[in-house]
């Protein structure tokens, strides 16, 4: 059984439910750290205008045969070299698909790896590209609007965090121990993007 190909198929079916996403994922993709990308559009529909494209989100997909498909979260080891590549382009959504022995059931897990989180994961990186970092992945939603929300929210934060790729992250601890005058002109904002709840 080809777990990689089956995993991609299950993910393609899940993404195909939505009205905001167009997936371009290939099991034979030759990119170094990715299997393709997912186009994210502002407006729902089966045909999308170029002007409505928000962003292409890079994705990496791993498929594995596992008997237990009921876990709410899993851990998966990712090479530091891949994490560095994800940071360099502004982020990646990483998928792991568990498939049962007969291949007729699957559980999809994901981690939205944005610059801020990637920098935290890379703190322990010592320069050895063959070392791995264990990352937690959560269950991927099943409803189409929730699936679209994962990507819409990711694109929002990916755009917001791009500027931080080459900068030192500001932590709550550093804010508490620094001179307040340094931050007199800093404005903190928060945001979240979702689909309209008017469609099912």
Where are each of the predicted segments found?
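A general secondary-structure signal for short beta-strands and their flanking turns/coil
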Residues: 31-33, 54, 90, 183-185, ...
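Charge-rich interaction segments
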Residues: 136-200
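Catalytic centers of nucleases
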Residues: 2-77
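Compact, glycine/acidic-enriched structural inserts
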Residues: 106-150
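Elongated alpha-helical scaffolds
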Residues: 54-120
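A generic structural signal for short, solvent-exposed coil/turn residues
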Residues: 28, 51-53, 87, 102, ...
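Short, charged low-complexity intrinsically disordered segments located at boundaries
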Residues: 38-46, 125-126, 182-188
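Short flexible/disordered coil segments
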Residues: 89-99, 124-130, 165-181
């Amino acid at each position: 059984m080809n777990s990689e190909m089956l995993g991609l198929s299950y993910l393609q079916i899940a993404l195909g439910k939505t009205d905001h996403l167009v997936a371009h994922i290939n099991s034979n993709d030759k990119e170094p750290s990715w299997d393709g990308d997912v186009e994210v559009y502002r407006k729902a529909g089966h045909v999308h205008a170029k002007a409505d494209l928000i962003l292409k989100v890079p994705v990496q997909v791993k498929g594995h045969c596992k008997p237990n498909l009921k876990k709410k979260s899993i851990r998966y080891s990712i090479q530091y070299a891949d994490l560095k590549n994800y940071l360099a382009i502004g982020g990646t959504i990483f998928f792991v698909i568990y498939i049962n022995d007969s291949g007729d059931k699957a559980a999809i897990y994901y981690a939205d790896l944005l610059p801020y989180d990637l920098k935290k994961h890379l703190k322990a990186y010592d320069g050895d590209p063959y070392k791995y970092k264990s990352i937690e992945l959560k269950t991927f939603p099943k409803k189409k609007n929730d699936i679209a929300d994962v990507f819409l929210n990711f694109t929002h934060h990916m755009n917001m965090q791009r500027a931080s790729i080459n900068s030192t992250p500001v932590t709550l601890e550093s804010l508490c121990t620094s001179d307040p005058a340094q931050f007199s002109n800093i404005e903190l904002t928060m945001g979240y993007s979702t689909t309209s709840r008017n469609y099912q």
